[in-house]
Design a protein with these regions (language model features):
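Outer-membrane beta-barrel initiation region
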Residues: 20-123, 127, 179-183, 191-198, ...
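C-terminal outer-membrane beta-barrel translocator/porin domains of Gram-negative envelope proteins
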Residues: 208, 215-335
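Flexible, surface-exposed loop regions and adjacent strand-edge segments
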Residues: 128, 138-145, 197-203, 255, ...
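Residues on the lipid-exposed face of transmembrane beta-strands in outer-membrane beta-barrel proteins
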Residues: 58-60, 72-76, 108-112, 166-172, ...
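Outer-membrane beta-barrel transmembrane strands
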Residues: 106-112, 152-188, 226-234, 246-248, ...
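Extracellular loop and loop/strand-boundary signature of outer-membrane beta-barrel proteins
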Residues: 93-95, 151-156, 200-206, 239-244, ...
Length: 401
């Protein structure tokens, strides 16, 4: 009880910081608990939709290798009914931030998961500059040697990356939990090297510019009980992508996710990712999988393989599996929870060989962690993992999957 008495004020204080850390690479829109009090039931008809609300606040988040991100957010949203699968019918979100090392970003998002019957829309426009982006080479056998990083070559595994672009995705409900999604995406990317020797400079020279216009169509089967803190159900998708980057490329992929409650407050979750590319994709296209309403960084980091640095491995094809158990150690009901995590991640990439289902060359790692859930609005995860590269600590906003 003493531990609970110490943690409860911290959770209540965190409510004041509601939404200050984005939920993963492309955050879902969330609303605080108080937003739901505005729903009005009238004798003349069914419950009315709540009014649109505005919130704005500064926050501190993480930027891989760039240090803390100091940012400001404006969030304009329409809260959903409390019992709904999502927390907002629709939301506009604008963020701007900088890092002490010179990184900066501006993003504008619009998400409407249930503003229109049987339709969902998401869109994003962004300009992001990362000054310590990690580059470790292409392929499954790349080596990361921390001893090789010295004062004479401090940026051996680092490169600057600037990305400008946007996307729009429209999803239509076909029948029951089956949906079809169409994504359009455009991006310009520029890599520039930092002072001294680097693996990137040895591979591509001092600068690499890329542009890419792509389209993706996917079928999605979604039976989750809710989208912000899933306890049971399936989220299955399969799709194909065509892109203009490089000399043109294609991609086939599938992402299969399942969630099973083991007991009150305990959930087992699993994910299988398989993707294969043809043609000549850009370097940046190898770094991400355009999954439904979100990207999956490939391969490494808190949203793919937690025992490795973000995008530790890159290749034309990828095979990834994740299993984890989430147990609410300190549940506070609607206020949130402190959750323990145990996970196992395994995966590999393919570059000079065809994709295949295999255990050869698969990188296996695992560990545990702690997650803090604040109301229905934010989930922060702290992961402690071990694998082929040794110990790795990562922080995520939202569940890994």
């Amino acid at each position: 009880m003493r531990l609970i008495s110490l943690l409860l004020p911290a959770v209540l204080w965190a409510v004041r910081l509601n939404g200050q850390i984005p939920d993963g690479p492309e955050p879902a829109d969330t609303a605080g608990q108080t937003a739901y009090a505005d729903t009005v039931n009238t004798p003349e008809g069914p419950a009315q939709k709540t009014a649109w609300k505005t919130s704005y606040f500064p926050y501190v988040s993480g930027a891989p290798n760039d240090g803390p991100l100091l940012a400001f957010r404006v969030h304009y949203f329409q809260p959903a009914e409390y019992e709904n699968r999502v927390t907002a019918n629709a939301a506009f979100t604008a963020d701007a931030g900088i890092t002490p090392r010179g990184g900066r970003q501006v993003t504008v998002r619009f998400r409407a998961p249930q503003l229109w019957k049987d339709w969902r829309v998401t869109s994003l426009a962004a300009a992001v500059r990362e000054v310590r982006f990690g580059y470790f080479g292409i392929g499954n056998e790349t080596v990361k040697d921390d001893n090789a990083v010295t004062p004479l070559q401090p940026f051996l595994y680092r490169v600057r990356r600037a990305r400008y672009g946007g996307k729009i995705e429209v999803t239509h409900k076909l029948r029951g939990p089956l949906q079809a999604a169409l994504l359009g995406f455009v991006e310009w990317t520029r890599f520039t090297t930092l002072p001294g020797p680097s693996l990137f400079k040895a591979s591509f020279g001092p600068e690499l510019k890329e542009s890419d216009v792509s389209g993706r169509v996917a079928l999605v089967y979604d039976t989750r009980d809710n989208e912000f803190n899933t306890h049971k159900g399936l989220l299955l998708e399969a799709g194909t992508q065509v892109g203009s980057g490089g000399d043109g490329y294609t991609r086939l992929y599938t992402v299969l996710r399942g969630y099973l409650p083991l007991r009150e407050g305990t959930v087992a979750a699993a994910r299988l990712v398989a993707s294969g590319m043809g043609g000549d994709p850009t370097l940046n296209a190898r770094f991400y999988l355009p999954a439904w309403e979100n990207q999956i960084p490939i391969l490494g980091g808190p949203y793919s393989h937690r025992s490795f640095d973000t995008i530790r491995f890159a290749g034309k094809h990828v095979l990834l599996g994740n299993v984890e158990v989430r147990h609410d150690l300190l549940p506070f009901g609607d206020l949130g929870a402190v959750t323990l995590l145990a996970f196992l991640d395994a995966g590999r990439v393919f570059e000079q060989e065809n994709f295949k289902i295999t255990t050869n060359g698969v990188k296996v790692g695992g560990g545990g962690g702690v997650a803090v859930r604040v109301l229905r609005s934010s989930i922060f995860t702290f992961n402690f993992a071990g694998g082929p590269d040794g110990f790795n600590f990562s922080v995520g906003s939202g569940w890994a999957f």
